[in-house]
Amino acid sequence: MQLGLSVSDSDASPFTPLAVLELAHDTKAEAIAWLLNRIRDKQRNGGAELLVDQLLFPAQDGQKPNPNVFVVGSTLQRLLSGAEDVGLFKEFQDGTMRGFTYANRESFKDFEGDGEGFLGDAECQYIVKHELDTLRAKNEEYIPGYPKYKLYPGKSIVRRLQSKGVLVQYFPLHNKEDLKRLSFSWYKKIKLSFQPLDDIRSYFGEGLGLYFGFLEYFTFALIPMALIGIPYYLFDWEDYDKYVLFAVFNLVWSTVFLEVWKRCSATLAYSWGTLGRKKAFEEPRAGFHGPLGLNPVTGREEPIYPSSKRHLRIYLVSVPFVLLCLYLSFYVMMVYFDMEFWAISIYHENPNFATSVLLFVPSIIYAVVIEIMNLLYRYAAEFLTDWENHRLESSFQNHLVPKVLVFNFVNCFASLFYIAFVMQDMVLLRQSLATLLITSQILNQVMEAFLPYWLQRRRNKRVYKRMRRLMGDKELPLLEQIQLETEMNTYLGTFDDYLEQFLLFGYVSLFSCVHPLAAVLVVLNNITEVYSDAFKMCHVFKRPFSEPAANIGVWQLAFETMSIIAVVTNCALIALSPQVKAYFPESDAQLILTVVAIEHVLLAFKFILAFVIPDVPKHIQVKLSKLDFESLEALKKRKILEVAET
């Protein structure tokens, strides 16, 4: 994909664009010149040493286009040296994964000639992003042309430009040929086989590769439960006593499922070079603010915000707000039960087809309300977490995730707990679970895939018509592509995707013993989810930058917490079984003590199983230990040589 357009630097040779930078329409000329100079400048002078050219779009319907759109690329040698700077791991000749060094490039597998094709597309774009993000202010006091926009020595220029609205967006470009091949092998043909995870990782990066790996693993892991659930559904529909065995299987399955996933995740992460990779030093978030102070770790000046003030905001504002939202969720739940009782009373007064259909209406309305409340709360939680002013993105996520998980858990499952343990109505529990699950699946598919696709398709048609009308029959595939991708929606990460799978895991593990078909419904949902998520990543959203990941992060803990709650829930459901109650006809206290004892035994078994099954396969542990040993030996030899020289 060679650049053959009007450019701002006539001396620049054509190069392959890897990313797009869009500055604000009214950005000062001196700020643009300063930024481009820093991007092009040599590394020894504090620059990124990248290639950058300006795109000149034609006027659109009498409106002047944004002239401040630039494409960024790099020479091959700069990418290879950048791979060493970011600590990229590649496969060595002996089959182990090692940190890439330019000096030893010939010792790495698949490195041939000058190294063309050695780095994947996503890796090249990640290197470019890293070099842009680590462009640091030197002795400038402010952004040229903006005296009020202060610069701090040693701090990221790009993050400062983003926080002040000068840099509108920057994103990696799609590679049409690679995308076409990936689309064909991924979702354009119906097949009963595994996803091309290595190709997904090579194109989108490790973070998305692990998400789709988890989605695939979760779907296949549900198949045994689905196969067992079908005969239970067909032959023992009203016999809840038979579901005791299904509940026990559920408990064992949820533990084994998560422990085996850790091993699968470690295998994928090692083969992709992220398992033993050290995390880069985390820069402050773009929105972080506070009075200027000295960072005790780096010794640089940067905004400082007292943790005491942040804690006051959390405990005096955020926590009460979350509790208020939980109260509103309970209130809406009680309104739903009033509607449910009203529908049941009408059915009992006049049982016919119309009133039998009416029985499902309250649950459907409640499911829609749940999705709306989850969406509104998500925006509020993000606003509050941003207002708490966390310095690092990891801290921001660690405070956002619990807020969202707690509310979504209560909002989605509180009614089911109430029906199961207060009303003790298993028929209504089965009906409500099925209705909530099916309705939420349909709404998620519409909101996540079909609606964005329809909006993007309309937007694409407008762009195609406008570009063809302006440029006639001229060949402009790259210009047209960049125009399209600039107007695409930004992919906000895997948060919502993991959240959806977390809730589905809850439906399966918490109450599936009273509705064994839940696993079947989730399997069908996830099969369509694979195709819809693949399509939206390829054609609906901007291509995201690669995000190195060694596991699914905080979501592993979230799923494990859900599995522990599932043990308690299923033990309680077993205790409500008439068959179990028959063993304790005279003493409810004895029944409760027995169930609690069994629950503790199952939890102990769960933790023992988690301890017995290693998180990392033995052969990978050996390779990692071997690498650590060789690194220590190399360090010893270097110290001996230094001593000998002195």
UniProtKB/Swiss-Prot annotation:
Residues spanning the membrane: 210-230, 241-261, 314-334, 357-377, 404-424, 502-522, 557-577, 592-612
Membrane topology, record value: Multi-pass membrane protein
Protein localization: Membrane
Protein name: Anoctamin-10
Keywords: Membrane, Transmembrane, Transmembrane helix
Matching Pfam families: Anoctamin (PF04547)
Database matches in InterPro entries: Anoctamin, Anoctamin_TM
Origin superkingdom: Eukaryota
Encoding gene, per UniProt annotation: ano10
Family: Belongs to the anoctamin family.
GO biological-process terms attached to the record: chloride transmembrane transport
Chief location of this protein within or outside the cell: membrane
